[in-house]
Amino acid sequence: MSVQKVRVERKIGDSVLSFETGHIAKQAAGSVLVQYGETVVLVAAASGTPRPGIDFFPLMCDYRERLAAAGKFPGGFLKREGRPSTKEILSSRLMDRPIRPLWPAGYKDEVQVQACVIASDLQNDGDVLAMIGGATALHISPLPFKGPLGSVRVGKVDGKLVAFPTADQLEQSELDMIVSGSRDMVAMIEGFANEMPEDEMMEAIGFAHDAIREVIDLQEEFYKKVNPEKTPYQSPEDDGLLQRLTDAYYSDFKTAQQTSGKQARAEAVRAVRDRAMADVIPDPNAADAVCVNRFKSVWHDLEEKVVRDLILAGTRPDGRDHNSLRAIHCETDLLPRVHGSALFQRGETQALITIALGTSRDEQRVDGLQDEYSKKFMLDYNFPSYSVGECRPIRGPGRREIGHGCLAERSVAPVLPSADDFPYTIRVISDITESNGSSSMASVCGATLGLMASGVPISNPVAGISVGLVQDGPDNWCLITDILGTEDHFGDMDFKIAGTQNGITGIQLDLKVTGVTNDIIRATLKQSREARIEILKKMLTTIPRPRREISPTAPRLLRTKISPDKIGALIGPGGKNIRGIQETTGAVIEVDDEGTVLVASSNKESAQEAMRQVEACTATVQIGKIYDGTVSSIKEFGAFVEILPGRDGLVHISEMSGGYISSLDQVIAVGDAMKVLVIDVDEHDRVKLSRRKALEELGEEDPLAVEGEGGGDSEGGGDGEDRPRRRRGGSGGGGGGGRGRGPRRSGGGRDRD
């Protein structure tokens, strides 16, 4: 690519969107710097020669975020970015989906589109800019891309639709949706909402399309200034093989496609294909790979034609009409020990759900360009190869699994209770144990069942459905509810919509055609709602509402709020107090900087005991209140008594008893229980206690006063209450009494200092 520096810009939404090329990445087939606000994304497209024998279009879209774009360093030992994060994988999929259908039929050159966020203002996300940049880079490249294509993110803040909302606005938004499209049609939708009614969702899509047209206007202006030379692409010539196979095997193939059952249907189709292959290639072992791949490609086209013709004629492969759902089966509580489990089956698609409930220690920490945050809800989607009867290498989750998991997670999230109402960290695992279409929506339904079975108080149950499309011209099209894998593969659309009886929570549109009209979208929303309500009714016959109690095997969580200045008292010196509570009760205690204390235990009794000790440890000492204390240490001048966990007060020897006591360690011992009254808390938060006044207020006899009646010499005898008064006047009798007074006064002074 060799052009002079070109730049165009236009205000869209609240900021300026700009494209620039001819300055950076000039050797790429097409490159563009996209800027919105102070977020800048570099997008470059490149192309390679097709690999021999390839039978698919090898398009790869990749999105990355350089943390230096926000002035940050990657965490960990190696201070550089590694494998893509979940956010980067999801953004890569967003780039790919609207671009993929916009290529000539039969085009198999390798194409890569790479996007990198190189500056971020932390308000304008780079994902939608990468989508715009990917389409723009391809549009100004020599490649035969059928652009232009625009994208926009839409929010709804305070009842008003907003194009390109900032991160702060999205925090308050009831909608987060990205829409891609051409000037006349919508090409892709990915959105999440708080139970938004269908008519409001349709309004938001129309609003997004208006903004998309503004983006396309800017792309067209950019295209004219760059004025690229497009390389013409010649589609492969028709060798007549498709017509030959159609004439010979269309009828047999049509019959095979109407066989009931996925496995039986696949075997019937395979039998017809094997006969056709033997006709075209008598000796497959002697044929070259090009010939075999050509047959497979043409046979795929014939299969597509048969399936689409059947659907347009009103017949689906499994015999249903266009609006019917497959048979639905729901179960809960399949598994022991787990905190919740469910099974959702729709036809030959089956999702096994397990639920785990944990504490804040189990939250997932997420770091990226934005400030680090934690997630209290996670939904993991797994798609093992046995679910479709195949053997494949066993690896970690791929892009598809991460994408499906995110769709299901964000579709369920709006109905979850707040952390204040339900402090548990929630993990949902959806294992797809059988698959024949729409497994992500089965995960949504199964997750709802599992959450209700585990006692999570969701506000409304959520169900999901996928609606397909077969179109033969602008006026000949039909929608099909609850699509099979075959219908997904050969159809034109996979429109997944999840929600409650009140409205939509998740929406995802994928197309194999260049776009669909608003009429098709509106009809799909209406048809999907009817199916969703029917599914919800069947789910609620299995479990009508969330259980009131969580599983007996789940941790018991109790929560309280303490004053932040009491956090130190709870933790204690070196963690002594909090560690002691945990060791004696077996509970786990967590406290945050705001004073929220969470107590978790495997059983209710230990959690309650730990909470009692936490409350005692952080309670405020009240003057005039009587406490049941324990002697923690004895000095010559008095005794220290623990009245709350980790909180001691001093009972001066003069406040120990109404009688005379010559030596405290002769009448009390460490560990003795003692009732004391708080008489003062000084400015240094030191507590002064009185055993004598506590007993007087309670009207109880003081055994120490009785023991002290005979204390001292003859001069110190007499009434016990008179003796301390005489000693305070300096006329104490007896050497023992006099000797004891001096050190007590001295010791008391040292304590006060």
Swiss-Prot record:
Tell me the InterPro entries matching this sequence.
ExoRNase_PH_dom1, ExoRNase_PH_dom2, ExoRNase_PH_dom2_sf, KH_dom, KH_dom_type_1, KH_dom_type_1_sf, NA-bd_OB-fold, PNPase
Pfam families assigned to the protein according to its UniProt record, in alphabetical order = KH_1, PNPase, RNase_PH, RNase_PH_C, S1
Q: Where is this region: Disordered?
A: 698-753
Q: Which reaction does it catalyse?
A: RNA(n+1) + phosphate = RNA(n) + a ribonucleoside 5'-diphosphate
GO annotations under biological process? mRNA catabolic process; RNA catabolic process; RNA processing
Among CDD domains, the record links this protein to: KH-I_PNPase, RNase_PH_PNPase_1, RNase_PH_PNPase_2, S1_PNPase
The protein's matches in SMART domains, at most eight in alphabetical order, are given as:
KH, S1
- Entry annotated with the keyword Metal-binding: yes
Q: What EC class is this?
A: transferase
Residue ranges annotated as compositionally biased, kind Gly residues, are 730-740
- Disulfide bonds listed in the record: none
Subcellular location as annotated:
Cytoplasm
The protein's matches in NCBIfam families, at most eight in alphabetical order, are given as: polynuc_phos, PRK11824.1
Protein role: Involved in mRNA degradation. Catalyzes the phosphorolysis of single-stranded polyribonucleotides processively in the 3'- to 5'-direction.
Q: What is this protein called?
A: Polyribonucleotide nucleotidyltransferase
Q: Write the gene name.
A: pnp
